């Protein structure tokens, strides 16, 4: 299913959830620093770069496209962290790891809407996301669980259902 928004086509899965893709963009393979971008709706808040998938677009391709548009970075797409449901907003987001190899000086959203980007230590990123984007904060917990459960790499990408209302989202 598709719906037209003023500047894009939104795609939905069979359950009516908007199909999205995002990346945890790390400065290096050590995955100690992650890149967050300012929200287009609330420029004083930080978010994980990502957005809606286009018709017929694969999740990994969408994730790479979105981070280039929103964060102005390119890199090596890594593992799928998981597929996260935001029941409140009816989104399903495929979240990947991306190791940044190129940082653009000017990029689409910096020019069009003045979007900013900043590197954060993982704990700091979790803290800034927790109050207004708890679903996104949960990406990092899932990343940690994947490391411990499978010695560094998740074998199967699980689907997580989280409520954006809780201060510490529960994974069901």
UniProtKB/Swiss-Prot annotation:
It is an enzyme of class 3 (hydrolase). GO terms for cellular component: cytoplasm; cytosol; glutamatergic synapse; nucleus. GO terms for biological process: adenosine 5'-(hexahydrogen pentaphosphate) catabolic process; diadenosine hexaphosphate catabolic process; diadenosine pentaphosphate catabolic process; diphosphoinositol polyphosphate catabolic process; diphosphoinositol polyphosphate metabolic process; RNA decapping. A motif (Nudix box) lies at residues 51-72. GO terms for molecular function: 5'-(N(7)-methyl 5'-triphosphoguanosine)-[mRNA] diphosphatase activity; 5'-(N(7)-methylguanosine 5'-triphospho)-[mRNA] hydrolase activity; bis(5'-adenosyl)-hexaphosphatase activity; bis(5'-adenosyl)-pentaphosphatase activity; diphosphoinositol-polyphosphate diphosphatase activity; endopolyphosphatase activity; inositol diphosphate pentakisphosphate diphosphatase activity; inositol diphosphate tetrakisphosphate diphosphatase activity. Keywords: Acetylation, Cytoplasm, Hydrolase, Magnesium, Metal-binding, Nucleus. Its EC number is 3.6.1.52, 3.6.1.61, 3.6.1.10, 3.6.1.62. Residues 17-144 form the Nudix hydrolase domain. CDD domains: NUDIX_DIPP2_like_Nudt4. It catalyses: diphospho-myo-inositol polyphosphate + H2O = myo-inositol polyphosphate + phosphate; 5-diphospho-1D-myo-inositol 1,2,3,4,6-pentakisphosphate + H2O = 1D-myo-inositol hexakisphosphate + phosphate + H(+); 3,5-bis(diphospho)-1D-myo-inositol 1,2,4,6-tetrakisphosphate + H2O = 3-diphospho-1D-myo-inositol 1,2,4,5,6-pentakisphosphate + phosphate + 2 H(+); [phosphate](n+1) + n H2O = (n+1) phosphate + n H(+). The keyword Nucleotidyltransferase does not apply. Mg(2+) 1 binds at residues 50, 70. Mg(2+) 3 binds at residue 66. The active site is at 69 (proton acceptor). It comes from the Eukaryota. Binds 3 Mg(2+) ions per subunit. The modification N-acetylmethionine is found at residue 1. It is found in: Cytoplasm; Nucleus. Its cofactor is Mg(2+); Mn(2+); Zn(2+). Substrate binds at residues 10, 18-20, 39-41, 89-91, 115, 133. Transmembrane segments: none annotated. Belongs to the Nudix hydrolase family. DIPP subfamily. Monomer. This is Diphosphoinositol polyphosphate phosphohydrolase 1. It comes from Bos taurus. The gene is NUDT3.
